[in-house]
Amino acid sequence: MFQNELQSRIEDLKQQIAAFPPGSITKKKINGKDYFYRRWTEDKKRKEKYIPMTEVETVRQQIEQRRLLEQELKTLKVQLSKSQPEKEIVTSPAFVTNVRTGKSLRVFSASVQKMRKRECYQQLYNFVYGEAQDKVFILYGLRRTGKTTMIRQIFAEMDDNELEKTVFIQITLKDTLADVNHDLKLLEAQGIRYVFLDEVTLMEDFIEGAALFSDVFAACGMKIVLSGTDSLGFLFTEDEQLYDRCILLHTTWIPYREFEEVLGIHGIDEYIRYGGTMSLGGVHYNETSTFATLESTDQYVDTAIARNIQHSLRCYQYENHFQHLRDLYDKNELTSAINRVVEDINHRFTLEVLTQDFKSHDLGTSASNLRRDRKNPTDILDRVDVAEVTDNLRKLLEIRNKKEQQVELDDVHAAEIEEYLNLLDLTQKIDVMHLPNVGIKTQRTVIAQPGLRYAQADALIRSLLLDEIFNSLSLPERNAIQERILNEIKGRMLEDIVLLETKMANPGKQVFVLQFPIGEFDMVVFDPNDAACQIFEIKHSAEVVKYQYRHLIDQEKCAQTEHRYGSITKKTVLYRGENQMVEGIWYQNVEEYLKNL
């Protein structure tokens, strides 16, 4: 490994290590009950902190991960010292926090120079190089959505003079606002102009004292960028401390267009399976996907979402903002409850697919396609009662959901947790309208990170099919049914992806599902200003089948729609095939549609 590569990897490791807690876990028995504590040494003093029972295993894994990273760091430092023994990296003793400046930032940014930039990068760039605004820039979002990478890309574009006026401060669990204030005063005296603070929400007192950044340092001409994964904490900070003195940029939502352009990955199925983070992409970002396995998916939900919410509530208004969730927090069940709500949303989605999406004509089409398959023709779906299997799966899922409810959640708990998930941009609501009964309005809950939903649904179906109730099915039969169900899940997820991205791209229009007593339009885009609408069917298929657009040419459905939503200007089937016109219906490739939004 070359010297600059060693230095770059060392800087990466330091950043990763800072995000994990130091120390070890110890157990104490008090009044016959086991209590767990994290113990570590800081400033030559031993410290310890209580760990709720539900968090012990996660903290244990984090400590082990830190230990492995520290071992790698130690090895690389030895290699670096051998390759350049006369040069030593010295941290200024004047600083309390981990401050990097000047040439070290060039090394820190070296590995991202060839990475493609996210679309929101330009907003960060404009703030850094635009006129001073007496505001701070907040770059926030869930883990692995490109926040720190964008900051490093800013460093990569700076010349040497600009880098000398720039610092990057990596906040750790031990840092406080007083520590940062101390260092910022020193940096201000040195003429530093650009300050980037990463993971600022790790500071326990950040939410209550964040006005320091805008009122003192930004007002004196510093350009300050705050970043971190604790999205909810930043929203609380804006409401409590910063008000109109901050610019917010949220990185959590990654549309298909960016998934393809930034990561260089093509295909809607890849987006369905892995979309939602910047951690899949070969040479561009990390090697493996966050949602490649159920274990990594569950860990992401636990650390990036559940603990995000709990940490923010604990640090906000001196723990006075838990509302009805206080009892769960006091019983150390809040993290588990949040995990459960996310899982419930995805299990309900899977249940809907099993209940609603398995129509006889679809099963017949699948069986026919398998029989005519050129490579591996089979009549396996003719020999299996898929409808009965599906019904058994649905019943089994309902039973499992009840058994797994270890934490009792009432409607108030679930509603409050879902509100926080909405604030994190993890979930979005899509309206479902009804005709001719216009008084009925329901909603779909869409997960903005499709890979998370698919991973949980996929694991659920695979585990259900292993139940003894399906012992009579051979392995090939189970695999065929599994593939069939997963294709249905992909089809429904494709609908949700198109609905969400169309809604986000058209804030001045209404985007919804329109249901009739029999059948529905998968998507309607209604423009109230033009008194007109477009109607869509969304299919996971790459084939053109007349049955797909039967609702679009239904005169009664179209007449009811035009009476309520104005003239229908276009009828479209979005699918995975080539663009073409079929009997007045525009068949458009869904990937092309999403990229052009």
Predicted regions and their residues:
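Sensor-1/coupling segment of RecA-like P-loop NTPase cores
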Residues: 216-238
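Domain-level recognition of nuclease-like catalytic cores that cleave nucleotide substrates
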Residues: 569-597
